[in-house]
Amino acid sequence: MKTIGNRYVVVDLEATSTGSKAKIIQVGIVVIEDGKIVDHYTTDVNPHEPLDAHIKELTGLTDQRLAQAPDFSQVARKIFDLVEDGIFVAHNVQFDANLLAENLFFEGYELRNPRVDTVELAQVFFPELEKYSLPILCQELGIPLKHAHTALSDAQATAELLLFLREKMAQLPKGLLERLLEMADALLYESYLVIEEIYRNQSILTSPDLVEVQGLYFKKTASPLETRKLSQDFSKNISLLNLEMREEQEHFAKEVGLLLKDEPVSLIQAPTGIGKTYGYLLPALSQVENRQIVLSVPTKILQNQIMEEEGKGLKEVFHTDIHSLKGPHNYLKLDAFYRSLQENDENRLFRRFKMQLLVWLTETETGDLDEIGQLYRYQHFLRDLRHDGNLSSKSLFVTEDFWKRSQERAQACKLLVTNHAYLVTRLEDNPEFVSDRLLIIDEVQKVLLALENLLQETYDIQSIIDLVDKALVGEENRIQQRILESIRFECLYLIEQFQSGKSRKNILDSLANLHQYFSELEVEGFEELVRYFTAEGDYWLEATETSQKKIQISSTKSGRILLSSLVPDSCQVLGVSATLEISQRVSLADLLGYSEAKFVKIEAHKKQDQEVVLVKDFPLVTETSIEVYAKEVADLLMDVQAFQQPILVLFTAKDMLLAVSDLLPVSHLAQYKNGAVHQLKKRFEKGEQQILLGAASFWEGVDFSSHPFVIQVVPRLPFQNPQEPLTKKINQELIQEGKNAFYDYQLPMAIIRLKQALGRSMRREHQRSLTLILDRRIVGKRYGKQIVASLSKEATVKTVSQSEVDETIDEFLNEL
């Protein structure tokens, strides 16, 4: 046998199934020597059994074609001769290698080649990607894949991927490759052989674009380019960005310009889909010369989106110095990561994650962990690696620290982009953060919730139990022991009561008991919990975002914080939204503490490309069990998916979303199941799945612009939960003022949320969408007329029976 060196044999098999009884139906082999493709081979194989319809559709193979193909025994020798002396490479190597080895074994050949998996190599060397299937990798890296699920085409693409990976490795410093090799036992197969080959031939010289500190390699920070002056003419700036200006956008930008000239505090309302972001940024950048502009958006998803889209355009065309600032926990703490590298961790997944981070450090300019594509897989390890906002003067990475760097960039840049949660937290600590600056708040109505969150505190109940258990071990005072035991009992009781859905009164009684016990507790280390449980305020239980089994206790202080109380007078404020008007008797400006703010409204025109369909005979959501209603929704989605159009389903509750997800028999994307919101958005936009089930920020914090047509489904009207702290407080305020909390606030807010939902899929001209509202209260309740009247101003509204839904969608799809 020849010496195994840098000869790679890339194999792809098509088979009758992916199970243990799979039979080979097609073989594709590509041979790489000295970094070049030198040979290829392909053959069909007769499985002597009919193919499933799914396999026929996937591969394009037919029973008739395979009936003419050779048996595996007739091609086994040729295949073995090709693969015998090489390193076996495949995408998901376990399937191909095991199936081929088994078939060769029955023909008298033993396949014992080392194995390389291009999936795990791609995960390490392309850490920013979210999916690692062969078609998606080819799409991301520009590798041709003409006939997916054809063995030779897939093998050719996998070979090109391997060559791409080798090139990527060759660009990395030798010291980094050495460190990766030291950790390569985290890889499942012999994939380290590829790294080892590149390492042997690698120069010891480090790339001039990288700097080495304590064995870590960082991308050198580029100096900002000299900013280009923007024109006072909005249309010229839009033209330079290679964009088409819309009439409504120009009108909006003109109004923004006037407000920035004359008004210290102003609010402007404009319809969705007109290009509001450029509409306020370009006038601001052209008019505000000697002040920094701070832009706050509702979510980190939108923050990232602006940096990737508008921010990228502003940097490229105008060299605008723009920076994105988030809370410290969003950044990698280098000291913590460095310490973790010194530890001999036995967890294979964590070691592989550390390999990813080592590569990522050579690429990132920000250290923002959101850049890592599959971050959700590593949440368990991130707790100790996230930045805590503190930096010791003795740190090994004082200069490179990402949080410190981000703070410095935030001070120096022209345009600072942040999110509402970080903005209000920072303002509470230091109002000077926006002194003498222009503060633009997009979706300004969402600041109300961010301000409410400042008043809230949350503790994980199991963490309290763990702390009590530790204290009980060393506590000698008998009375304090009893108090700790009582606290432990009440915590366990709360978990049991919440998970079983028992009486709310029992929970309130137990919370009252905890208040009493903590007021008597004098054990060291419990000071924060004593303060928390003895403070005045409302308390409630809820499951965490990540798990229904993890229960947390939350509280809110009485009263509300007004935005005006946090923002200094020297700061100019511009609030922007598609939905600022609440009702005739309730003003958002009043709720924010800016009753004197100038208000401008850009009237919305009725969109011809948008239709709202009300289903009048769907089961009544308030009188139907969650199981039955979820089944009805799932059945409707199965009918609608036959139109082969993207479907976005917007839920108001996590339990309903998960119930529908469990019942859907087709592959789909679901929030709380398939990764972070921004990852789901990207996967849906790329067409990876036809159906996306979303809640929370999908109503108003995520935009979909890539699909020319989207079907939206709203199973339930988005009324705010009257028990939510913010809603409860505002309701109480309005009642004290003699107003009707439902008609003056809750109903208008539901209409606002519906309109925001309609705007998710109307982000550009000629984009079309149809929204199905299944909650029949909209046609049966008195307040439904108010909702319909408001929606009718912006879109065509139809009322149909469930049996007419398919026909209605078909008609809309076929309209010019």
PLM-predicted stretches and their roles:
Residues 1-3, 164-234:
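Acidic two-metal-ion nuclease catalytic site recognized across multiple nuclease folds
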Residues 2-114, 127, 131-145, 149:
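Conserved non-catalytic scaffold segment of RNase H-like nuclease domains
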Residues 87-94, 98-104, 133-195, 771-773:
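Acidic, Mg2+-coordinating catalytic module of metal-dependent nucleases/exonucleases
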Residues 235, 291, 300-304, 308-413:
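A substrate-engagement module of RecA-like helicase motors
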Residues 261-282:
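Walker A/P-loop
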Residues 389-415, 420-518, 580-592, 723:
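Signature of the SF2 helicase/ATPase Hel1-core->accessory helical subdomain module
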Residues 390-411, 430, 516-624, 695:
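A contiguous, basic/glycine-rich beta-loop/short-helix subdomain that forms a polymer-engagement track
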Residues 617-625, 676, 680-775:
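Conserved RecA-like P-loop NTPase helicase motor core
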